[in-house]
């Protein structure tokens, strides 16, 4: 068993890394939370790692939401509808995730990481218009997308921003910056719903979660400060981080392939 002090340092450091990457490049950073909790911090049970990671992602998302809200980036009507509707999917997805064997779930998680990496490698389109009418009809169009994104978020215990942001842009036509800001309410709420579902089953390590979150807050501040200086190199940073995700994804697949692909 890992001693408490080294494990605490690993949790703080891992949280700092996730927070730093989130602050530096935005969406996709939280995908590393579960692998870090498993293979660096030393949580032995996959479901506990997923539940603990979901709680950490939730807190970080709400913290980032405050900054975006102050800048006027959040379109609250659509954000609230998306979060409320998607929470139903998150509860259903997390319930299904708890029922699946841990190694099988991690193998699927590894495949998801490859998808996230591929999406990060795609060039982002710049949207400059912000005149889209956000009436209730437009917002309700996002319900189906919200249910799907929430289910995926709950199933894997991730933020799901890589699904939510394009989903909001597709359904409402809102600019990227508003989709990013508005998505954070959903990311935080989905993560909270997933964490509560796992907590009911005793599948959260609260001490490690607190340490991971603490490291994430500090790392996030550092990442945001550095992001300002490296704004012109954002695409390069995305490619580098996508490559890191691919490496970790193959490691996760390798570690859990025996359960899915028995020889």
Segments predicted by a language model, with ranges:
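Transmembrane helix boundary and interhelical junction motifs in multipass membrane proteins
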Residues: 25-34, 157-167
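Membrane-helix boundary/interface segments in integral membrane proteins
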Residues: 194-199
């Amino acid at each position: 068993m890992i001693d408490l002090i080294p494990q605490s340092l690993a949790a703080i450091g891992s949280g700092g890394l996730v927070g730093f990457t989130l602050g530096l490049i935005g969406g996709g950073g939280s995908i590393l939370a579960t692998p870090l909790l498993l293979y660096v911090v030393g949580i032995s049970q996959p479901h506990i790692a997923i539940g603990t990671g979901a709680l950490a992602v939730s807190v970080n998302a709400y913290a980032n939401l405050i900054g975006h809200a102050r800048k006027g980036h959040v379109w609250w009507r659509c954000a609230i509808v998306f979060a409320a509707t998607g929470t139903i999917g998150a509860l259903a997805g997390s319930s299904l995730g708890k029922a699946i064997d841990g190694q099988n779930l991690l193998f699927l998680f590894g495949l998801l990481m490859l998808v996230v990496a591929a999406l990060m490698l795609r060039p982002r389109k710049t949207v400059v218009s912000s005149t889209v009418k956000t009436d209730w009809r437009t917002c309700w169009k996002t319900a189906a997308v919200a249910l799907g994104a929430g289910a995926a978020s709950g199933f894997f215990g991730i933020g799901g921003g890589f699904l939510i942001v394009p989903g909001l842009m597709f359904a409402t036509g809102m600019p990227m910056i508003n989709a990013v800001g508005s998505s954070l309410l959903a990311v935080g709420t989905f993560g909270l719903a997933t964490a509560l579902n796992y907590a009911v089953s005793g599948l959260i390590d609260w001490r490690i979660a607190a340490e991971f979150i603490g490291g994430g807050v500090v790392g996030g501040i550092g990442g945001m400060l550095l992001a300002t200086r490296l704004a012109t190199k954002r695409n390069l940073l995305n490619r580098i981080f996508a490559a890191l995700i691919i490496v970790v994804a193959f490691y996760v697949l390798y570690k859990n392939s025996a359960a899915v692909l028995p020889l």
